[in-house]
Amino acid sequence: GKPVVWTMHDMWPCTGICHYARECTNYQQECHNCPYIYKGGSKKDLSYRTFRKKQKLYSNAPVHFVTCSRWLKEQAQVSRLFEGKSVINIPNAINTNLFKPQNKEEARAKCMLPQNKKLILFGSVKITDKRKGAEYLIEACKLLAEKHPEWKESLGVVVFGNQSQQLQEQIPFHVYPLPYIKNEHEVVNIYNAVDLFVIPSL
């Protein structure tokens, strides 16, 4: 009976079973024949059964949903599961006492990055996650190298996240792979060490 505020970080609350529906729009009416289940699922597959369970749970529950992005709010609002439900967007807060401009040379020294290059940054928990758009970054870097071959020695790409080494052979500039970083102070150093942060996420 008590009101519940549910903060969404992906689409799972508003779909049958998937965290990101991608091209599938079944969740807007009713999940079934899930394209992410082996052989495309079936009429009453796991996505259908879970969707119906969520529908039953949500129907009489005083749940208010909060999303961290406008995009996620838009996806949630068209879900049949959320009919009549409150969905609002509250962006994640940023600690401006921590995330603020600092000395670039000192930051590069802490991250063991070169002082004599322009550096582009790309980061993700898992670099090979297609939603993060690494393929677009690779394509953009190739175009940049074609148009400005003179930048090949003066430009570098810093990549942090799991499997970051995989981009070393695919980007025509020197790549500085870093592991996935949880420590916020280390993340602040990386942001301050680079000249440009790229977000090619889909």
Q: Model features per residue range: what roles?
A:
Residues 2-38, 64-66:
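Active-site proximal beta-strand in glycosyltransferases
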Residues 63-64, 86, 113-121, 155-156, ...:
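Charged active-site motifs of nucleotide-sugar-dependent glycosyltransferases
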Residues 68, 90-93, 122-126, 160, ...:
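Short hydrophobic "strand-cap" motifs at the C-terminus of beta-strands
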Residues 101-119, 150:
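Nucleotide-sugar donor-binding and catalytic loop/hinge architecture
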